Amino acid sequence: CSSDLPQIEVVQIQFNYADFDDPAVQAGKCYEICRKHGKQVIVMEPVRGGSLANLPDDAKAVFEELHGGSPATYAIRYAAGFPGIMMVLSGMSSLEQMKENVSFMKDFRPLDEREMKAVEKVREIFRGKNLIPCTGCRYCVDGCPKKISIPDLFACMNAKKIYQNTNSNVYYRVHTRNNGKASDCIKCGKCE
């Protein structure tokens, strides 16, 4: 099947356990398409911009029970453990983080069944955070008189609920720079 697209040798995708079945990112589906076409995959965002390293306490406790490394370790090993992954790009901001990443990638082993169950438990915790259900289809955006990028703002709110960090504030500012803010909504109902 790789002969279908001979000009493409490798594909780089955002791939991590939080985005695997996320309707906006669709990391799992992107990965499956790469594999269907026989393409090697380079992973970016295995720790989702640091969000999967700084988990809420209930999610962090799941990995702590395993006694096998930091949340970032599990996130990177999750991404690296899939067939066809040729490289995992992980941003690091300290020498300590680099040493940690090198230590478990040097003698790499994919997540075992117990660890995969822990990842799924963390994903269940994320899903239980009373998130705004949005597929990111963007149908609601077309009729908005205030040009509010509704799915992007929902994604920011969901990220804030899950990860409790300020990255979502940065993305909110990015998405509202040339579009309406949530507070600009006039409740016209065209998005319904």
Protein language model features and the residues they cover:
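Short Fe-S-cluster ligation motifs
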Residues: 162-190
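Beta/alpha (TIM)-barrel catalytic core signal, keyed to glycine-rich beta->alpha loops juxtaposed to Asp/Glu
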Residues: 1-135, 139-148, 152-155, 167, ...
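Short, intrinsically disordered, charge-balanced linker/junction segments flanking boundaries
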Residues: 1-2, 188-192
